[in-house]
């Protein structure tokens, strides 16, 4: 569960290294987000000569959270860090690679491109 002003790692090669969540695009009264939710982020740290620059405001999909999630079969899955993948306005990925494991629940939300690029799906 991530809230506004939470800082996350970026799990793709778009050029950003760390972002801060500034808005949840769920339309929900609950302000927290979970895996598969779309959020508005601002880039806090970026590599030089990357696709994105520091200070840019972009959309992102949450792919890993430290809090984890409970599956229907009763198992609980947690990750070591909070991570997002940057997307464009039309929903396509900004980067061409995805680093680290991602949750299987992204398939249910329709992010098949992230699933196919990820090295491991848990």
UniProtKB/Swiss-Prot annotation:
Check the record and name the Pfam families matching this protein: Ribosomal_L14 (PF00238)
Instruction: Report which superkingdom the organism of origin falls in.
Output: Bacteria
The UniProt GO MF terms for this protein read:
large ribosomal subunit rRNA binding; structural constituent of ribosome
For this UniProt record, the keywords arranged alphabetically read as follows: Ribonucleoprotein, Ribosomal protein, RNA-binding, rRNA-binding
Q: What is the lineage of its organism?
A: Bacteria, Bacillati, Mycoplasmatota, Mycoplasmoidales, Metamycoplasmataceae
- Subunit details for this protein? Part of the 50S ribosomal subunit. Forms a cluster with proteins L3 and L19. In the 70S ribosome, L14 and L19 interact and together make contacts with the 16S rRNA in bridges B5 and B8.
The UniProt entry, under SUPFAM superfamilies, shows: Ribosomal protein L14
Q: What is this protein called?
A: Large ribosomal subunit protein uL14
GO cellular component, as recorded: cytosolic large ribosomal subunit
PROSITE patterns per the UniProt record, alphabetical: RIBOSOMAL_L14
Q: Which family does it belong to?
A: Belongs to the universal ribosomal protein uL14 family.
Q: Which NCBIfam families match?
A: rplN_bact
Looking at the keywords, is rRNA-binding present?
Answer: yes
